[in-house]
């Protein structure tokens, strides 16, 4: 697998939301530590749902508690957002990020009010697990397993679950319930993406919004791509993030050597 493709698809500029969000998260972290403790108004509390505190319910992914917390979340979510944004559009991806935050917060608050009423959470790692679950569903339809070593493979669909528990072991202070809820939402989004589309604004609304803010979109620097609604087609089939000869694996063993297959021009997700 070509890891570079996760960050900078060949011959393509960086995606606008992925870059902008990374910069914004960093700026908020600096403001919180140097200017004003903004995290006090962003961290999600289990009682936030019952107080109808919309700031905390939707904005808690923006709050980070340490530099390493910020660094690992920016690095892990960047590639996921790049891939999703390229195939779904910048504005639509922003809507999805907000929906994921809200629909993760609701069950977290319900569970947390009973089991851990005094625990606050923040950070974008829930987004990472949601997108990880989403891409695992899509990838599992192309590759049923991922090669870990030359002799050991792991089911593609359950790889995020393994990573969920590894993360809990390596970072015991992280929110396992929040990550698990985010992962379940990602699985749901991958399995029922047409259902998710029904709770997002219609395409014509997104196009209208982009028309209104077009002067601002045109200010985006060269080398950073804003994927407009008119440029994307969310009905296109998923393309594996694995490149070259690994892009498809057989689902069963065969005793006869496979005949050479035509190697067409591959494309990165969303092209």
UniProtKB/Swiss-Prot annotation:
Q: Which GO terms describe its molecular function?
A: serine-type endopeptidase activity
Which sequence ranges are marked TM in the entry?
A: 16-36, 64-84, 89-111, 115-137, 152-172, 176-196
Q: Which Gene3D superfamilies match?
A: Rhomboid-like (1.20.1540.10)
| Record EC number | 3.4.21.105
Active-site residue list? 125, 179
Swiss-Prot/TrEMBL GO biological process terms = proteolysis
Q: Enumerate the UniProt keywords alphabetically.
A: Golgi apparatus, Hydrolase, Membrane, Protease, Serine protease, Transmembrane, Transmembrane helix
Domain of life from the UniProt record: Eukaryota
Catalytically driven reaction(s): Cleaves type-1 transmembrane domains using a catalytic dyad composed of serine and histidine that are contributed by different transmembrane domains
**Major place of residence:** Golgi
* UniProt-annotated location(s): Golgi apparatus membrane; Golgi apparatus, cis-Golgi network membrane
Region: Disordered, residue numbers:
252-271
Cellular component (GO) terms are: Golgi membrane
Entry's InterPro entries?
A: Peptidase_S54_rhomboid_dom, Rhomboid-like_sf
Q: What class of enzyme is it?
A: hydrolase
Tell me the Pfam families matching this sequence. Answer: Rhomboid
Biological function = Probable rhomboid-type serine protease that catalyzes intramembrane proteolysis.
Question: Per the similarity annotation, which family is this?
Answer: Belongs to the peptidase S54 family.
Name under which the protein is recorded? Rhomboid-type serine protease 2
The species is Kluyveromyces lactis (strain ATCC 8585 / CBS 2359 / DSM 70799 / NBRC 1267 / NRRL Y-1140 / WM37)
């Amino acid at each position: 697998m070509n890891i570079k493709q996760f960050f900078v698809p060949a011959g393509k500029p960086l995606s606008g939301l992925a870059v902008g969000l990374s910069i914004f998260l960093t700026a908020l972290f600096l403001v919180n530590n140097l200017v004003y403790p903004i995290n006090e108004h962003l961290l999600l509390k289990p009682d936030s749902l019952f107080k109808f505190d919309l700031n905390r319910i939707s904005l808690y992914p923006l709050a980070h508690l340490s530099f390493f917390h910020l660094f690992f979340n920016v690095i892990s979510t960047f590639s996921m957002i790049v891939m999703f944004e390229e195939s779904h559009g910048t504005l639509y991806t922003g809507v999805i990020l907000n929906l994921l935050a809200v629909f993760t917060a609701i069950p977290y608050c319900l569970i947390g009010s009973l089991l851990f009423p005094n625990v606050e959470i923040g950070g974008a790692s829930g987004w990472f697990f949601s997108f990880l679950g989403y891409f695992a569903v899509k990838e599992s339809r192309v590759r049923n397993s991922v090669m870990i070593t030359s002799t050991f493979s792991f089911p593609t669909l359950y790889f995020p679950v393994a990573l969920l528990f590894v993360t809990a072991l390596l970072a015991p202070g992280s929110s396992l319930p929040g990550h698990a809820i985010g992962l379940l939402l990602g699985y749901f989004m991958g399995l029922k993406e047409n259902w998710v589309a029904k709770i997002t604004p219609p395409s014509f609304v997104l196009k209208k919004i982009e028309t209104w803010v077009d002067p601002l979109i045109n200010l985006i620097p060269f080398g950073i791509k804003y994927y407009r609604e008119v440029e994307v087609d969310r009905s296109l089939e998923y393309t594996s993030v694995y490149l070259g000869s690994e892009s498809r694996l057989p689902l069963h063993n065969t005793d006869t050597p496979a005949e050479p297959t035509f190697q067409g021009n591959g494309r990165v997700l969303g092209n």
